[in-house]
Amino acid sequence: MKKTIAIAAVVTAMFHSVNVNAADHTFSVGYAQTDIEGVNKNLTGLALKYRYEPGRLGLLVGLTGTTLNESTTATIVNNQVQINTFDRTYGSIHIGPTYRFNDMVSGYATLGYATYEAKRKSGDSVTSGFEDSNFAAGAGIELNLTQSLALNGGVEYSEHLINSTALTYTVGLGFRF
């Protein structure tokens, strides 16, 4: 009987330590929405995050990409209809520390690099456009819903062109392993 209890205790301890170590990593995929000052519609896209948290302190790396494709006008050139479009893209990469407040909640702050590009196209050719890059800063929280499931939300700020600000909001669902 004592051997059975001892074996059960050792197996339980091994299983528990594997679970604790297994939850050091979180990979999240989520929805991103960028609000750029002076643009009537929001850019929408994808946010990817990877978090490594071996203890109270950890590290987060994130990638964000959003786009907006607008058809503006149609013109007739040489008896063919050409659609004029305006394409906008925003992308960023950021990295920063995480801090675990308790078993369920951790927060993060990031610094990174963001680009914003806009192109006006007439048919298949680009008629005008611009691209601007700048530093970006962000912050957010991550909630561990279960041992293997996490929910995160955050905001990212960057400035582009002549005092035009970009705010990107993200919400994601992650798998802890």
Name every feature range the model reports, one short phrase each.
Residues 19-75:
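Short glycine/proline- and aromatic-enriched beta-strand/turn motifs that initiate or cap beta-hairpins
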